[in-house]
């Protein structure tokens, strides 16, 4: 998002740029952020502009190994309700990013939403029921 100035054909006193850097790998994300920050600093210096850079990690990337307890239990629960797990990677963010970033191993489970993040998003009742069944399997004690 770029916010700059209040009139056409006028040099603004302040320009604000907001964006995000995403990667499956935290080191790559940090490297890409630092590259962008250095480009902005160099360009600001060339024209004598002042620059301030603030950042925070909203979603830290994570990978859960297939050998982990959490992964195996999730696969077990999905199979127990008659489905075949199809692990996917995503650049999207979820609570799982925050939990993993705090050392609590977790997996983001899709619930079968169709057309996610759109005005046409919906879920089939059968998929919602299956999601609840998976959740129940994950919390049950055998």
Regions found by a protein language model. Name each.
Residues 44-45, 79, 100:
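Alpha-helical segments within the soluble intracellular
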Residues 28-31, 66-69, 123-127:
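Alpha-helix N-cap and loop-to-helix initiation/capping positions
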Residues 62-77, 102:
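Short, low-order "capping/linker" segments at domain edges
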Residues 1-45, 49-60:
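Midchain, well-structured core segments that form catalytic/ion-binding scaffolds
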Residues 134-142:
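C-terminal alpha-helix
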Residues 50-56, 82-89:
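C-terminal helix-coil-helix/basic helical segment that borders enzyme active sites and/or dimer interfaces
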Residues 83-134:
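Zn-dependent metallopeptidase/amidohydrolase metal-coordination segment
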């Amino acid at each position: 998002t770029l916010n700059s100035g209040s009139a056409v054909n006028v040099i603004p006193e302040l320009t604000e740029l907001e964006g995000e850097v995403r990667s499956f790998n935290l080191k790559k994300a940090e490297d890409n952020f630092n590259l962008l920050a250095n480009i902005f600093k160099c360009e600001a210096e060339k024209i004598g502009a002042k620059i301030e850079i603030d950042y925070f990690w909203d979603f830290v990337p994570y990978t859960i190994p297939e050998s982990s307890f959490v992964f195996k239990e999730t696969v077990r629960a999905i199979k127990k309700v008659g489905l075949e797990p199809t692990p996917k990677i995503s650049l999207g963010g979820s609570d799982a990013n925050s939990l993993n970033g705090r050392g609590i191993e977790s997996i983001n489970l899709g619930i079968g939403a169709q057309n996610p993040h759109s005005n046409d998003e919906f879920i089939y009742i059968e998929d919602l029921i299956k999601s609840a069944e998976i959740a129940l399997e994950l919390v049950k004690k055998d």
